[in-house]
């Protein structure tokens, strides 16, 4: 092979490699390592903020007091191991979530004390996140959002 053909082949291989590495889906990659969901309410009494962190082995929910009349409440922490296959299902839903095209904030989270919610997914390429009105559906994220909300409900104490 002459030098020109060799350089052309090398250049083509580099272009194909570069293009195949581009993320055109806007979805987290298959190596999802963490999913975080938060809720917050600006004008509330009692536990006003929560953070749910889900990793391949467990789910941890932290509830923090805030608002009016709650400064003496302790921070609460609840955790449970994930059931067999639960992380795989979450990671698959996270990898299928369509963050591309979504703005960083949807609607007006916590306006008129409706509460705010967020969802973020971390993989080897970084973190994709979105904030939105508490309890609202986000079609592009819905399967994952449903699973995360179910885990939050399972860890939240009945008051």
Predicted regions and their residues:
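Short, well-ordered, aromatic-rich surface patches in folded extracellular/luminal domains
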Residues: 2-7, 22-44, 49, 78, ...
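Bacterial N-terminal signal peptides
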Residues: 9-18
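N-terminal secretory signal peptides
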Residues: 27, 38-71
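A short-motif feature that recognizes glycine-rich, charge-decorated loops
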Residues: 63-101
